[in-house]
Amino acid sequence: MTQFNVGALLKKRRRVEEEELRYPPMSKKILFVCTGNIARSASAQYIAEQLSGSDSEWTFDSAGTGAIVGSGVAPFIDSELESRGVNFHSHQAKQITAQLLEESALVLVMEKEHLNWIVREWPQYRSKIHLLKQMARVQEQAGRRVNPVSFMHALDQPPAKEDRIADPYRKGAEAARVAVEEIELALTKIIPWLGA
C-alpha cells in the first residue's frame, strides 16, 4: 500500500498554483477589431474560425471601437462571406472592453486609427496590438519556427501604409469584396503560423 505525504502534496500544489498566478498559461485567443464590428473584424473572426477548423485550440473573437452593438454583419459583407461558405449568422456586434483585451494573446486591427484608439484607452496592452495585414507581412520575415505571439509582442516596427484594410461599410459590393479578400489572404498566412 502506497503512503502519501499529504503535507508535501499540498505544499507542491501551492507552488504550482503560485507559478500559474505569476506566469499564467498563454492565451490562445485572437481578438479582431475594426470600427463598428459589422464588417472587417466580424469577417476576420468567422474566416479565421473556418480556416482553423473545429479542433483548433485557438479561439477568435471580434469587437469594435465604436461598435453598432447588437447588429449583425453588414450588407454586401454577408454576401461575400456566404459565397465563401463562412458561417456568420450568429454574429452580434459588441464594443471592445479591457476584459476582451486582457483575455487575448493578440489584438489584430484593420487600420492604424484602431491601434491608436485602443492604446489611448488602454496603453498597457500596446505590445498585443498590431494590424492584421502587418502580421501577415512580417510572418514571412519571422519564419515558421518563431513563436508568432512572442514575435508580435516584441515587434517594434510601425505598420506600413499598405497594411491598412479600408472600411467597406456602405461602399457597395466591390468594396466589400476587396475587404473580405484582403482579410482572407492575410489569414491564410497567419492561421498556419499560429498552428491553428
Annotated model-derived regions:
Residues T2-S104, K112-N116, P192-A196:
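Conserved active-site segments centered on acidic
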Residues F4-L10, E20, V119-A196:
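Phosphate-binding/catalytic loops
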